[in-house]
Amino acid sequence: MQMVTPPFKGENKGHYTAGVISNGMLYVSGQLSIDPDTREVCPGDIREHTRLALNNVDRVLKHAGVQRDQVVMCRVYTPDVKYWGPINEVYADFFGDHKPARVIVSTTTLHFGCLVEIEAVAELTSD
């Protein structure tokens, strides 16, 4: 097992690692819409929150040497299912022709008032 910890400003207060490689798979912990360099919550709309959370997922992928087209599954958490449309638009732009399995889960609130949290699972090698 290998821990994947991309650099970011400040200290992570949660008891978890950004990513874990195990048995040929990368498991990316939930990435909030928080800027990793400033540690500030995204001030924008749902599209900007989604873009930032996906960029944070991408940051973990890249740190592990994994490409977006190796992602096999994402879970997207949001406080309201009404955001499904704009989340889907940004998600489609991010992944392009690649369509990993996905679920969008409507929750109550997310930590720090974020509008999106995304976790992912990726293969270390593509077929």
Please provide the spans of the model-predicted regions.
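N-terminal presequence-like segments and the immediate start of the first folded domain
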Residues: 1-55, 59-72, 78-127
